[in-house]
Every structure is written in structure tokens, then in C-alpha cells.
Design a protein with these regions (language model features):
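N-terminal Lys/Arg-rich, disordered targeting/topogenic segments
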Residues: 1-13
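The feature marks non-catalytic terminal segments
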Residues: 18-33, 45-50, 107, 111-115, ...
Length: 342
């Protein structure tokens, strides 16, 4: 009898301790959430900037892979779109080297929807991932085996949607399709990746430059503002500094990691002091990374484990360099007085 009483007392004591622990944990969580809400409650970035710069403007993002859009524009696209910009996101490849095109394209659309960008604003050019297409080698999709543009089930590649046929995998066709999609929508602003440390990033960057050269020669009155940036050195492979004080700004990559350490960036003519900084709406940020809208979008790219790089990608600004499109040399006929002009 006495032993039963002792057991009941022990059980009661254990239950009381457990309940006390649960209540303590709940109290800590409540206090944390309350303080976090206080820290995160702000008016955000002055929307007059996005309203004055992007309202009723056309903005196009051109990137190699599904998830690269988040690296270079994931934090600025939402305020652009919310303040009246007509946004288009163009993916050059299907990202299908190890994962199906359907998976990558679905992830991209789901991620952008997390940021408020609807699926109809997304364009897939449908070129292969991880090939030597850009240097004239014959290219095939690693996952599908096809040698022409395509899209996953439920999606359409741009060339087929526009012209009724698929485009063969050639460097020239990619340039043609980039030129076509730019001229079709005629964006006022173009955000694109520059000469990054990735084969596809470099190839698409060069293809974009070739397409823009053609466009500027053909359309002398069309001079969109082109902003280019690095998705690897300033995002995917940058410092994991979300919880550091420099969340206020993207930090410059260590020079020894550059293609040539004697320059500040991977493109020699880009000086760090000449970068263009677009502010981030603080409402999309939080002192808890799990609350950040960019983190939620990155979490949709499960095949790439993109959320694991959130501490590197999420920043207090987005950094670009202005690629001038108003140079008279684009319309000039070049000649030489002697020697070989080739």
C-alpha cells in the first residue's frame, strides 16, 4: 500500500516537472515571438523608390537556371511587382542535368509564387543544362536525351510557344531566342547574370551580350537599362553573413577568390564603388531567417537544397553593375586603314 502511494507521488512529481518544463518552453517561445515582432515591425523601405523607378515599367530577369533568379533578384522583384512593374522571368536552360525539367520548372514557379509573382510571368527557353553548347559542341539534354528545346509536362518552351516548332540546341539559336524574347516584351529594365564562375552562367551571359549587341544595332531607339551581377561570388558562394551586422549590405568577395585577384570583381571593369545598390523592403526580411520571404522561396527549390545557402543569399540590398546601352559604337560601322580587320 505504502509503495503504491510512493509511486503515485513520484508520477505526480514527474508530471508536475514535465508540465513546468513545457510551460517554461512556451513562455520562452512567446517572449521570443513578441520581441521578434517588435524587431521586425517597421515600415520597410520607402516604396516611393520602387514606385518612382518601376511603376508601369517592364522588368525582365534573364538567368541560366531555375533558382538563379532568386540569387540576383529574389529580394527586389516583389516590391517591383507590387509597385506596378510588369515583370517577366526568363530561364535559359531547363536545369535538367541531374533533375528533370518538370521538377526544376515546377520549383521555379512555386518559388516565384511565394514572392507574389504568378506563373504566367515565367518563360522557359528550354535549352540544356551543363553542356558545351556555347562552344559549338553538339548538345543533348542529360535527362531527356533530346537535342532541341523542350519543357516539362504542363509547361511550354518559348520557341515552340512563339513559333510552333522546337529550336535545335545550338549557341546561335539561344542567342536568337534571347533576342526574340527581349524584342517581344521590350523591357525597360533587364536584370541578368554576368561572367560568373559557372559554365552555364558564363555561356548565357555571353549569349545575352551577343543578343543585346544585335538589338542595339537594329533598334537605335531602344536602350533598356541593363543591370548585371554575380550570382555565385555575391550570393551562392558568398559569406554566410545573415546574422552579421553587414546584413545591411552585400559584401565584396575576397580578391583571392576572383578569376584574377588583381581586380575587385570577376569582370575587370566593374569597380566596387560603382555598383548599383537596390534597397530591400525590410518587411521581406526578419531577424529570424525562417520568416524571410526569400528563404521561403528558396525552400521551394528542394532539388538544389537552395535554402541551405540562405545565409549567403539574403542581404540588405541587391548589387548590380550598369551595362550602358546608349553607346554610339553599337551603331557604328568599323573599318581599318591597314592590316587585317578580322
Amino acid at each position: 500500500m505504502a509503495e503504491n502511494v510512493k509511486r503515485k507521488k513520484k508520477k505526480r512529481a514527474v508530471l508536475i516537472v514535465l508540465m513546468a518544463l513545457v510551460l517554461a518552453v512556451l513562455a520562452v517561445v512567446c517572449v521570443y515571438e513578441t520581441e521578434l515582432n517588435k524587431l521586425d515591425s517597421n515600415d520597410g523601405v520607402d516604396n516611393s523608390f520602387y514606385d518612382s523607378q518601376f511603376k508601369n515599367k517592364k522588368v525582365m530577369v534573364i538567368v541560366p537556371h531555375e533558382d538563379d533568379d532568386l540569387l540576383i533578384s529574389g529580394q527586389v522583384l516583389p516590391p517591383m511587382y507590387k509597385n506596378g512593374a510588369d515583370v517577366r522571368v526568363v530561364f535559359a536552360t531547363n536545369g535538367d542535368k541531374r533533375v528533370s525539367a518538370y521538377t526544376r520548372q515546377s520549383e521555379a514557379c512555386n518559388a516565384l509564387e511565394k514572392l507574389g509573382i504568378p506563373r504566367e510571368k515565367v518563360i522557359f527557353l528550354g535549352y540544356p543544362d551543363g553542356t558545351q553548347l556555347y562552344v559549338g559542341k553538339k548538345a543533348f539534354s542529360f535527362s531527356s536525351g533530346w537535342d532541341h528545346t523542350y519543357a516539362g509536362k504542363g509547361f511550354k518552351d518559348y520557341h515552340f510557344d512563339r513559333f510552333g516548332t522546337h529550336a535545335k540546341y545550338t549557341a546561335e539559336n539561344m542567342v536568337d531566342d534571347i533576342e526574340s524574347v527581349v524584342l517581344e516584351y521590350r523591357p525597360d529594365y533587364i536584370l541578368a547574370k554576368d561572367f560568373d564562375t559557372h559554365t552555364d552562367h558564363r555561356g548565357v551571359s555571353i549569349s545575352f551580350e551577343k543578343a543585346m549587341e544585335r538589338i542595339l544595332k537594329k533598334e537605335s531607339g531602344y536602350t533598356p537599362k541593363v543591370l548585371k551581377c554575380f550570382g555565385y561570388s555575391l550570393a551562392w558562394k558568398s559569406k554566410p553573413d545573415f546574422y552579421a551586422l553587414n546584413i545591411k549590405s552585400t559584401v565584396m568577395q575576397d580578391r583571392e577568390k576572383n578569376n584574377d585577384p588583381s581586380y575587385e570583381t570577376d569582370v575587370p571593369q566593374y569597380r566596387w564603388n560603382n555598383r548599383v545598390r537596390l534597397p530591400i523592403d525590410k518587411k521581406s526580411l526578419s531577424h529570424s531567417i525562417l520568416r524571410c520571404s526569400e528563404y521561403k522561396a528558396l525552400s521551394e527549390h528542394l532539388s538544389q537544397y537552395a535554402y541551405c545557402y540562405s545565409e549567403r543569399i539574403i542581404n540588405g540590398d541587391s548589387v548590380y553593375w550598369n551595362r550602358r546601352t546608349d553607346s554610339l559604337t553599337y551603331n557604328a560601322d568599323i573599318s581599318v586603314s591597314s592590316g587585317d580587320a578580322s
